[in-house]
Structures are given as C-alpha cells and as structure tokens.
Curated annotation (Swiss-Prot):
It comes from Aliivibrio fischeri (strain ATCC 700601 / ES114) (Vibrio fischeri). The lineage of its organism: Bacteria, Pseudomonadati, Pseudomonadota, Gammaproteobacteria, Vibrionales. The gene is sthA. It is found in: Cytoplasm. This is Soluble pyridine nucleotide transhydrogenase. InterPro entries: Class-I_Pyr_Nuc-Dis_Oxidored, FAD/NAD-bd_sf, FAD/NAD-binding_dom, FAD/NAD-linked_Rdtase_dimer_sf, Pyr_nuc-diS_OxRdtase, Pyr_nucl-diS_OxRdtase_dimer, STH_gammaproteobact. Transmembrane segments: none annotated.
C-alpha cells in the first residue's frame, strides 16, 4: 500500500474507487468541501484508463502520425524525394512521455488537496467496508460513510478469442505491440477502431477495417460519415461493412479472420475493438445488494446514486455518454450531491463529440437526418476549408464546417466539422448554441468580427452561405 499523504485513519467520509476523470472530479470536489477522502486505484499510478490506455495515448499517437504525414506532404521537405518513416513502436515513446506528464500532474492534484491514495484492488465486504488487495497480496480494510464507484471500463473480450496470443490485441494491449506489422485487421469500426485505423494507415501499414454496421460511425451526420468513408478509401484503408466474425485463427506468423459471410482475411495481427464493458466484476457488489447489468454497468438516478443510497457511480461504469469530459463533470456533480444533498448541475443537453481520426471530426447538436425525421424546417450553411486563407497557409485545406439552423428563428440546431482541429473549432459554435433564447442565432457569426486569417473564420463563411439560402 502506498499513499500520497499519511493516512489518518481507516475510516473516511468518502471513498472513491478509481482515479480516472470521474474519480478525480469527485475526489477534488469532496476534498475542497473539507471531507476526509480516500481514492483507491488498482494500478501503480493515478489517471485511470483514460490516461494510461485510452484517450491520452491514442491521441498522442495520432498527433505523432499527423506530423509525419504533414512532413511527408510538405513541398518544403519532400522536394528531394526524402520522406520520414516511423513505426508504431517508434512513436510509442511520444505517447509514454505524455502519459508520464499527465500522471505527475494528476498526482500533484491529490498531494495538494491532501487526498489519501490507496493502491490496490477494491472489493466490498459489507455496507460501509471495502477490502483492498495490494500487489504483494496483503489486504487492508477501510470504512466510509459514502462510496463513489468510478472504475471505468475495459475492452470487451468475447469468448473463443485468445487475447494472450502475441498476434491478438485489444485497445489496451495494442500499446504493448512488440513487433511492427505491415498489415493489420481492425475488428470494430467505432470511434476507437476508426482512430487506430487512421494511426496505422498513416504509418504505411495496410489496414482492413471490419465494420459490424452498414456505415462508418452511423451516429454522425451522414455527410460526416460519408466524408470519413471517402478519406479512408482514398488513403488505402479497406473497409468491410455489415460483417461479423465467425472465428479467428492466430498463428506464429499472423492471423486469419473468418467472417460469417464466408470471407476470409489474413494479416500480421488483429486489433479487436468492438465494444467495452464496465469494471464492476471484482467489486463484490452482491455484498452491498447491488447488481450490474450484462455490460457491467450500474443504474443511477439524477444525483448519481445507485439503488444503495450511500453508494454513487460515475463515468463509463454507468454507460452513456462514456466520455472522459462528461465523467469528470459527473464526478463534480456527485460531490455536490453528497455535500449539499442534491446535484446542483447536470450534463448539458448537447455534449460535443470529438473523433480523432485523420482528418478529425467533431459535432454538437442535431444531425440532418434527425431534423428531417422530426420535420424541423432547417437550413444549411457550409464553409470549405480549402477557401480559407489560414487553411491554405497551413496546408490543411481538407475539411468543412456545416451549420444547421432553423429557417424562421435562425436558432442554431447543430454544427458538424470535418478536418484539422475540428474538435477545437466546434467549441466556438457550441458557445453560441448554449445561449438562451434569441442569443442563440446564426446571425452572431455575421455580426461579429473574426481575426484574419483564422480557421474560426469558417463560421462567418458558413453563416453567410446559410443566410443567403433563405427567401
């Protein structure tokens, strides 16, 4: 057992299980309200899956690959027919350095706020008691008045696949890839699968992307999904839609995937990225009268309370939206519920989505298909990045911004962006969308002055384009 500050007692006002974004948000909120708080983390360092296997490393890898692509496509550098080549193992070092920085920073949060850190696997013993099993096998028990379960999720591993084989990976173990594949199969074309397809293809690896649905990222606006499909095709990624695996053969020299349709695919290795499950199986929930669903998730009310009054849950372990940003907010709201009797805030209605493929995608609000189904009289304003001076200067002219707005009230209903820095660009429009009443209007972008040249100017161009469609 290791702790950031000396543990004053084995009893705490609150114990948070898990130090990912949800656990961190809850712990910080509770300690700032002067509660005696402990946080239990099963891994050797804080940060949770987001920091060590999920959001941070995958985005760091994506950034490194993007810079390689930029170097190789820039006429300033490639005029001598020289190009920069890196392997997956080469760029893992960049991800590791970012993870280390994030871990040190988050460790500092707990140190400054005198939050006790306990390292080990937590499981409930009875209503107000948890046992923590350390790496050396020793067991300590702790009691608390309140508990917050923030244990996150892990990749779904179906039976019949040998994930211990050196050629078979999930989205956690892929960060321990020991060889440099020339050809990879990625099963699952959701956000994680699509992001890794971009990363590997950017490194020159042949990618077969197997999608269990009829289109890529079907929750997106159709134009965004179509744009991603085109760019994947244009980059050389082979996408197989509407396919399900039957079984996987893993050999010393590669893998063969057999599909239910009768097709067979062969590659050096496979990344299985189809679904996630909540980390609740080792918590011994039955000891406190709780039961997770088939996906390992817990039900909570508006205050993030489970069916057991003094036990709360946040983050991936409660399902949608399963975003690091939302989990942190849920943790803060839970701290409010515990200290003030009620969560004073809740997640916003329109949570932005950021997908770090190459190119990037981000959206907030309604899609065209949703507005059409609801018979909302909307209009569309578009801006192509290739017409923006800043994009031309930066050589980032692939992409577009689309604003959906009500024809009569001019209220912004949805914003969809495809291209470099899309996840940053989206927040400009989101800020206006969140305004109340008449303040949410597409006319804002026409009546304000933007810096020039900027990518933000896409909003002015799209707004003018959309307003010119009205009659």
């Amino acid at each position: 057992m290791t702790n950031s500050t000396p543990i004053r007692s084995t009893h705490f006002d609150a114990i948070v299980i898990g130090s990912g974004p949800g656990g961190e948000g809850a712990a910080m909120g509770l300690t700032k309200a002067n509660l005696n708080v402990a946080i239990i983390e099963r891994e050797p360092s804080v940060g949770g899956g987001c920091t060590h296997w999920g959001t941070i490393p995958s985005k760091a890898l994506r950034h490194a690959v993007s810079r390689i692509i930029e170097f190789n496509s820039n006429p300033l550098y490639c005029k001598n027919n020289t190009s920069l080549h890196s392997t997956f193992s080469d760029i893992l070092g960049h991800a590791k350095s970012v993870i280390d920085k994030q871990t040190r920073m988050r460790q500092g949060f707990y140190d400054r706020n005198q939050c006790s850190l306990i390292f080990g696997e937590a499981s409930f013993v009875e209503k107000n008691t948890v046992a923590v099993t350390a790496k050396d096998g020793s067991i300590e028990t702790y009691t608390a008045d309140k508990f917050i379960i923030a244990t996150g999720s892990r990749p779904y591993r179906p039976e019949g696949i040998n994930f211990n084989h050196s050629r078979v990976y999930d989205s956690d173990s892929i960060l321990s890839l020991k060889h440099d594949p020339r050809h990879i199969i990625i099963y699952g074309a959701g956000v994680i699968g699509s992001e890794y397809a971009s990363i590997f293809r950017g490194l020159g690896v042949k990618v077969d992307l197997v999608n269990t649905r009829d289109r890529l990222l079907s929750f997106l606006d159709n134009e965004m999904s179509d744009a991603l499909s085109y760019h994947f095709w244009n980059s050389g990624i082979v996408t197989r839609n509407d396919e399900n695996f039957e079984h996987i053969e893993a050999n010393d020299d590669g893998v063969i995937m057999h599909l239910e349709s009768g097709k067979k695919m062969k590659a050096d290795c496979i990344l299985f990225a189809n679904g996630r499950t909540g980390n609740t199986d080792k918590l011994n929930l039955s000891a406190v009268g709780l039961e997770a669903d088939s996906r390992g998730q817990l039900k909570v009310n508006d205050n993030y309370q489970t069916d057991v009054e003094h036990i709360y849950a946040v983050g991936d372990v409660i399902g949608y939206p399963s975003l690091a940003s939302a989990a942190y907010d849920q943790g803060r709201f839970t701290a409010q519920a515990i200290t003030k009797g009620k969560a004073e805030a809740r997640l916003i209605d329109h949570i932005p989505t950021g997908i770090y493929t190459i190119p990037e995608i981000s959206s907030v609000g309604k899609t065209e298909q949703e507005l059409t189904a609801a018979k909302v009289p909307y209009e569309v304003g578009r801006s192509s990045f290739k017409h923006l001076a800043r994009a031309q200067i930066a050589g980032k002219d692939i992409g577009s911004l689309k604003i959906l707005f009500h024809r009569e009230t001019k209220e912004i209903l949805g914003i969809h962006c495809f291209g470099e820095r899309a996840a940053e660009i989206i927040h400009i429009g989101q800020a206006i969308m969140e305004q109340k009443g008449e303040a949410n209007t597409i006319e804002y972008f026409v009546n304000t002055t933007f810096n020039y040249p900027t990518m933000a100017e896409a909003y002015r161009v799209a707004a003018l384009n959309g307003l010119n469609r009205l009659f």
